[in-house]
Amino acid sequence: MAGSQQQQQQQAVSKPTGGKHGNNLPLWGNEKTMNLNPMILTNVLSSPYFKVQLYELKTYHEVVDEIYFKVNHVEPWEKGSRKTAGQTGMCGGVRGVGTGGIVSTAFCLLYKLFTLKLTRKQVMGLITHSDSPDIRALGFMYIRYTQPPPDLVDWYDEFLDDEEELDVKAGGGCVMTVGEMLRSFLTKLEWFSTLFPRIPVPVQKAIDQHMKSRPRKPPQKDEQEEEEEEATAAPAADTGRHGDKRRSRTPRRSPSPRKSQNRSRSRSHHRERHGASFDYELERERDRQRKEREGKDRDRDRDRDRERDRERDRDRRRSRTPDRNAERRRSRSRERRRSRSTSRDKRTERKDRDKDREAESERERSRKKDREHHKDRERSKDKRSKGEGEERRHKDDKEEKKHREEKRSKRSRSRSRDRKHKAERSSKKRSRSGSRSRQEAGEEKNRKRERSHSKDRQHKRSRSKERSHRRESSNERIHARQERPSSESGERTNSVRADSP
């Protein structure tokens, strides 16, 4: 049998990992949740083990080593952390997503593998690992959650008759082979208290047909196993019914590969088969849980009966000892006295406290009054200073306004004076120019008259005298013309001096 297992592993390893898609392994379904139940995923993400310890693991080989040392079952919840026997999914009488229980180490590491985005070669290394069946189980579970349903048969077909055993239940008690586990993966959605991704109906029918064509092979027993079964058959017959119950509750488990020195895949098959399947194991587990619940109910009834017996004993003791009532009365009177004295002390303490509180309140009131008085003084000072400042500003504004008005009046007066001076100067200039023009006109008239008289008187004078006379008249004209511009220039200078301030 060990030789056949090694041949299967060699065939699986020699299977071409490239294929059409190469070494890259496509993911099916939700690429963020790995198609996990929301309750399990929430508990995985909030687990301190996943957030702290697994966060430090960065490589595929580190995660495989962690699986080897930490995983001892492939159930989603730890033992005793979820009180919902026989129920799956989101049911179980609990409300909310995060109320499932303590998520198992196996599922934390399974989601860690999903975060690494495994290649086809790495997945083949998981499902053909020779050190631990738990590593192989997580590899097959990774395929069930992440690969397309039509490809599941191609992945599992070579391992449907694998006889390597592992205990899949938390706390032990459910030993099965790898082949039985894979057949359960293909034919059932339920896995303890969770569900696998649903398989489409046509694909499921094809898988069922394939499983019918691949019936389970009877286990091949070695000679050593037959001898062990014969040796254990005799004491088993003597133990009786109780021994059978004890053996059915805790079926034998193959030795762990971690305790073996050579870590070989050849495991000793110690459990009795007799046609037992995985369904039978589950049914037996449910019976065990039902019996445990019945035992708990019996324990509760026993506790109630014991409590009743204790009450009866107390009543009997009370009836037997009547003196206890007197003693109780005395103790009650003592307690009353003590309570009275304590109450008096408490009253005095309360009075003292009240007095202290009143004195403190009076002090606080006086402090508040002083503060308010001081604030009022400060406010009055501020108001006075503000009023004085406003009055000063008002006076300054008035003075500035008066000064401005005076300046304006002075300017207006100076402007009026300048206008008057200008008008007087212009009138003087006009009068002077008129008088001068009149004088010149009179002089010319006189000259003309003299000329006419001279012409009449001296008509008979000589030409020399006439020439001299003409020269003199011309000289006079020239002299008169020269005097006119000089007089006009003098008047202009005088007017300019008068206009200048």
Curated annotation (Swiss-Prot):
Q: Which UniProt keywords apply?
A: Coiled coil, mRNA processing, mRNA splicing, Nucleus, Spliceosome
User: Looking at the UniProt record for this protein, which Gene Ontology cellular component terms does it annotate, in alphabetical order?
Assistant: precatalytic spliceosome
Q: In which residue ranges is the amino acid composition biased (Low complexity)?
A: 1-11
The primary location reported for this protein is nucleus
This protein's superkingdom? Eukaryota
Residue ranges with Basic residues bias: 243-273, 329-341, 409-435, 448-468
Write out the annotated subcellular location: Nucleus
Q: Which residues form a coiled coil?
A: 281-302
Stretches with biased composition (Polar residues): 492-501
Has keyword Nucleus?
A: yes
Task: From the record, give the transmembrane residue ranges.
Answer: none
Give GO BP annotations, semicolon-separated: mRNA processing; RNA splicing
* UniProt feature, compositional bias: Basic and acidic residues: 281-328, 342-408, 437-447, 469-491
Claim: Protein biosynthesis is one of the keywords in the record = no
Summarizing the function annotation, the protein's role is: May be required for pre-mRNA splicing.
PANTHER family, alphabetically? PRE-MRNA-SPLICING FACTOR 38A-RELATED
Family under the similarity heading: Belongs to the PRP38 family.
Name of the protein: Pre-mRNA-splicing factor 38B
Organism expressing this protein natively = Danio rerio (Zebrafish)
